């Protein structure tokens, strides 16, 4: 027997075009916490599929990605360097309930960002 098999889900996770994401792209330049995606309502959390942050300044900057006030990823970005995170289906970064995605910068240096995410019920 020959033919194609269409896999549309893995467990409860819908694959492909079944998932709708929102795209956020802008620049953060304030030292300290910069909210890049607002917190969803109670009983919901953000699910990050892809994230890119680029240091657009000439100054090395420590970057901390947070779920609300909790640091989840930390690193130093050299001048004009970027980080890129892309998560496989089912392995996306799930933030805490009703918590914003926050980009903390060690200095007032311009950083561009692009984020693809969705909101999911707890």
Indicate where each model-derived feature is located.
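Beta-strand-centric surfaces of beta-sandwich/beta-rich domains
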Residues: 1-122
């Amino acid at each position: 027997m020959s033919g194609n098999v269409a896999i549309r889900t893995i467990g409860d996770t819908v694959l492909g075009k079944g998932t709708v994401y929102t795209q956020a792209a802008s620049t953060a330049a304030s030292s300290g916490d910069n909210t890049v995606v607002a917190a969803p309502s109670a009983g919901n959390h953000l699910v990050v599929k892809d994230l890119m942050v680029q240091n657009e300044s000439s100054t090395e900057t420590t970057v901390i990605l947070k779920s609300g006030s909790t640091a989840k990823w930390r690193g130093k970005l050299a001048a004009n360097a970027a980080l890129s995170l892309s998560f496989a289906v089912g392995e996306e970064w799930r933030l805490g309930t009703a918590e914003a995605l926050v980009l903390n910068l060690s200095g007032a240096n311009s950083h561009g960002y692009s984020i693809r995410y969705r909101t999911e019920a707890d």
